[in-house]
């Protein structure tokens, strides 16, 4: 799937827009920005869809280039966030002396800081966003090193510079960042942000630049190597959320955090267990999946096989996959018989001739880099068109066998799923009146089950007879050994307060309040 299609897959349409209204300082030295919301009606959906889609195009593009906490927050610095349509959370930073203000995405899925340059003359998008002017800053230092961040339909480019970066009340000295001088296309023109501040590990930083977060620690600006996210999903609240640098804010979560170790530096990636629908195992992650906690992704992205099962369970719209139906019609009974004969599931599709490998191949994770993406294409060239459909059918049949379904019921079930495959455009509508009948979807992390109720994974636009509802799940397929992979975006982080513990290299989740 290309970046444009992937962008649509992450589009979210909800009902409000936030603007900064006031600034305030707390006695403990933290910094907050007051927020308010401007409600949007469903008639604005097309316009907001376009903007959100382009923002997610950028997120996917940038990502494709890159390879016992408690107490009060008195020693922490708090940055409030602006919630744009529940699709993205923004905050304000400043660069230079005197400070030049920018609205940025605080993104745990990347590691660079970039903003438009005052030297960006030939990209229309630069004229619609705040631009950094080095000549106006007494703390500016020249680097001269060129920078380019590639994405599916082009790239943004510019050069590195150094200056003071203000985040809340913290001033990070001599921070390396990218001044962009070329921002082609509509992606950046319609974006609601000026730039991006990455909170991932340095391993995925373009140009090996030191991330802002690293310099906060090196310069002794915070006492604890921890930051945490609270994303407010309450449509009636004026607060969009907040990041706490240096700790956590106890008033935004209840109970204890469940921590899991980071398994691969770069992204905040960890091992995840089974995914459950109404308490029943989907079987897909029985032997483990990887997951990334990503504040820059709006929805929950996961393997098509599981998202299709969720679609069916919640009655989501989808598309009919003729390839899927053909495989089920011709090989469904054979796959069922082989599973009943206890054939190793990973070998079934190669055994019946639909896949040219036996499930033990290795393919680079497309999320890491453009080069890896090309390698993935060439590696997967061996696969026949029916191979992915066969692999999904194996998963679906296994899940039904575990529930002791009859053979006739199993064949009907997988045929029904073939008619509810996730749309290439990513949008899956659901019936708002059926929310109370939809199942809980759960994720197993660190041995604990984290539930999402229908009202938490379904995004509602408008009220009354004009209300529209969209599923918060979208498809993303990453093959082994990097996958299967889930990206736990804002839909998940909105329900669960998230701690990014840099010192112990772990991620923690607790119920948000």
Curated annotation (Swiss-Prot):
Residues 25-71 form a propeptide. Expressed in seed pods and dry seeds. Residues 1-24 form the signal peptide. SUPFAM superfamilies: Acid proteases, Saposin. Residues 319-424 form the Saposin B-type domain. The gene is APA2. It comes from Arabidopsis thaliana (Mouse-ear cress). GO terms for molecular function: aspartic-type endopeptidase activity. Glycans are attached at residue 404. This is Aspartic proteinase A2. GO terms for biological process: lipid metabolic process; proteolysis. Keywords: Aspartyl protease, Disulfide bond, Glycoprotein, Hydrolase, Protease, Repeat, Signal, Vacuole, Zymogen. It comes from the Eukaryota. Involved in the breakdown of propeptides of storage proteins in protein-storage vacuoles. Its EC number is 3.4.23.-. Disulfide bonds join 120-126, 285-289, 324-418, 349-390, 355-387, 432-469.
